[in-house]
């Protein structure tokens, strides 16, 4: 049996009781280590689980899935995923490959950023499509996310923006030369995301958002040192949210007064927040 086990958002204690039971009985335990990171290292997981954990990078999961699934028709294999197991399409692919091989699979769900973002006080049913923000380069600044956010904005819904992480990535030069040299890990910050959003708007010029649009930055959701900051996009380009992982929510104009009251506590500057709320006509249907 292949088990996909959600680990939750913060540390080794966030696994569910059912998930821990699976981990303890499995023949092999893999930790998916590239679509998201847990806020503790692998050694802490191993100490808590009382058994070794095999780190599964992008290459192993996407091209070596048969190695992960080896003998899973006879023994239990646990595949651990930060957040919820189906937070990335790669994990769906793994289940489909297991089906092709006649291997049964079972999912043990857990909290993910999609539900955890409720810690901002923004009501989950007021969210529209979720988008991803990748690191821009000098020659590559994709803006396809802009159109999805535009649809959310047009109907007044919040947008959760998931921020890029680069783990065990190669430079183009090293890839071209066939050298297995990896770049240092990089994790996008709320400040970088806000700056890139303003850069995209400057390029597109469709008025979907602007420097005075309100947003909420969230860091290390679910952890003891979770941090929330609310403000305009311009203000958020200057905030330091600390260590990863970060997310950003662009507020929709249908935001409720209860949501305003909740997030105002985290404002960079309450007077600026109040002015942006009023001038942006937030709270209107």
UniProtKB/Swiss-Prot annotation:
It holds the Pfam family TP_methylase. One of its GO terms (cellular component) is cytoplasm. One of its GO terms (biological process) is methylation. It is an enzyme of class 2 (transferase). HAMAP family: Diphthine_synth. Belongs to the diphthine synthase family. This is Diphthine methyl ester synthase. The lineage of its organism: Eukaryota, Fungi, Dikarya, Ascomycota, Pezizomycotina.
């Amino acid at each position: 049996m292949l088990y996909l086990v959600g680990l939750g958002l913060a540390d080794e204690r966030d696994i569910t009781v059912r998930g821990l039971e699976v981990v303890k009985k499995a023949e092999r335990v893999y930790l998916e280590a590239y679509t998201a990171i847990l806020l503790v290292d692998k050694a802490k997981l191993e100490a808590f689980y009382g058994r070794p954990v095999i780190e599964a990078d992008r290459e192993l999961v996407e091209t070596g899935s048969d190695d992960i699934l080896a003998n899973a028709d006879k023994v239990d294999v646990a595949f651990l995923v930060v957040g919820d197991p189906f937070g990335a399409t790669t994990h769906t692919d793994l289940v489909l490959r297991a089906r092709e091989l006649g291997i049964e699979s079972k999912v043990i769900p857990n909290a993910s950023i999609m539900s955890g973002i409720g810690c901002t006080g923004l009501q989950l049913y007021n969210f529209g499509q979720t988008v991803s923000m990748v690191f821009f380069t000098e020659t590559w600044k994709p803006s396809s996310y802009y159109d999805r956010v535009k649809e959310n904005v047009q109907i007044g819904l919040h947008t959760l923006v998931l921020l890029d992480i680069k783990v065990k990535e190669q430079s183009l030069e090293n890839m071209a030369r066939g050298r297995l040299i990896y770049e240092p890990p990089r994790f996008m910050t709320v400040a970088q995301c806000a700056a890139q959003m303003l850069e995209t708007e400057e390029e597109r010029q469709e008025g979907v958002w602007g420097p005075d649009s309100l947003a909420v930055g969230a860091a290390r959701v679910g952890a003891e040192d979770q941090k929330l900051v609310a403000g305009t996009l311009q203000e958020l380009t200057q905030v330091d949210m600390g260590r990863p992982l970060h997310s950003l929510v662009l507020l929709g104009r249908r935001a409720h007064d209860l949501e305003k009251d909740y997030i105002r506590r985290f404002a960079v500057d309450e007077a600026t927040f109040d002015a942006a709320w009023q001038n942006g006509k937030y709270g209107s249907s």
